[in-house]
């Protein structure tokens, strides 16, 4: 191939025996047998075993060479003896007897012994797959990426993105790039701002999403747009959210309904998940209204692998003798029931721990419970306050059987739903009810258009302000704002929100009215969203879109619990790039050029 290699380190086979070959790569493992030294040479593609004889003048050099140094070797391919064949690597039937060694780059540890100790330990993890603190891994990410598991995650990411692009182009979408330096947008998170040198006191914003631009493309006459879009949001890190930067399969279509968008996404993601995972993929993408999701699952991100369903049992406890719930109901609260199959025989500590966990971790004031023994007899602290009719109604509504239990959460409707949802998740996990070998998708639809913000004491948009309300202008003018639904939808997989989307509002009179309900004047809308307003005055087609998160898709397909494991150069949980030392201070000269001053 060239002076560095005739073959990759995964290529040589028995039919290459007696050939002279040249290989290059990293010294992965070294085994000293006195007169012989065996080296596993690793490149991007695989591993080949090298043999160094002590009669060569470079024997001492290879003997003293540190692991992960880069070398080029020339030698003769030999067949291994039957008892030394390594079936775990593709080149395991051969080895290369080295006749020439060239050291391309030797590992050198830092002169400071403490730093050198850190470097030795992280270097050793490449072969051993030993885990190290996240900050150390990210500081030496160039070494961390040499580990097989980490490298495979990045390869998988590349393959998934390539497949997404292929499938979108196959369906007639155009890959169009939108600006990175732009104006602040209303997605809801904090912006990353970039000062303008040529316009002192003014700032660009890095896009939280290409929302406005992709809508402008539809107004421009393009009917199918997509890109693997970089998005920037100043948010705190979570297991499923990387701080700072993330990527999404951003798409928009014109002259479409909600179902048209669903069909594109279902076809695309089913193919991607089926291709890149050994897990089964459920072809069914059920539609679940937001209201139903909050009632049955206690979350707008339900994990459908969990078979437990929450029930509303408020009416059963109304006017009952259980005064805690009775009093709550009289004050406008609700009661939700969560079944716990085959737990009636569990010790009291099982139930006490769930109650304590709900109080400490979920903010619950407490949980009630009833157990039904093998004969179906109700027991527990609540049972004695309920007559047989009420107990039978609980059994019927929650579908519990003899030997099962039921937990109860009572609070304001939203709080009770959230607590019940978290208890459902906890029970599903602890009772082993979740099938880890399947992907289950669902659509959450019919979100509220508006929400009442208790802090600001005013009505605000629940999600995307640019979505079309059900009923259009008529509903905005005649309905209670909190009863209006939106053509907004989320795609969820195994309890992880993959994306949000909407059918857009393409009519200015509806847009002005919607923003007016949220407290914005026409002048404010014109100022804040001038480009979109101008465009909509010149014929805007019905359009809609969605943007599944690429990082989250890869996280699910790689079966990783943390999204940072599938990002090549991630930030840590504090939003720091410890490899490059960002964020960093800027010198005064640079600040003056930008008309900025740091206030301590």
Swiss-Prot record:
Superkingdom, natural source: Bacteria
EC number(s) on file: 6.1.1.23
Chief location bin: cytoplasm
Region (Aspartate): 211-214
Cellular component aspect of the GO annotation: cytoplasm
One example GO MF annotation: aspartate-tRNA ligase activity
Catalytic activity: tRNA(Asx) + L-aspartate + ATP = L-aspartyl-tRNA(Asx) + AMP + diphosphate
Positions of ATP binding: 233-235, 497, 549-552
Enzyme class: ligase
Keyword Oxidoreductase: no
PANTHER family the record matches: ASPARTATE--TRNA LIGASE, MITOCHONDRIAL, ASPARTYL/LYSYL-TRNA SYNTHETASE
Name of the protein in question: Aspartate--tRNA(Asp/Asn) ligase
Source species: Wolbachia pipientis subsp. Culex pipiens (strain wPip)
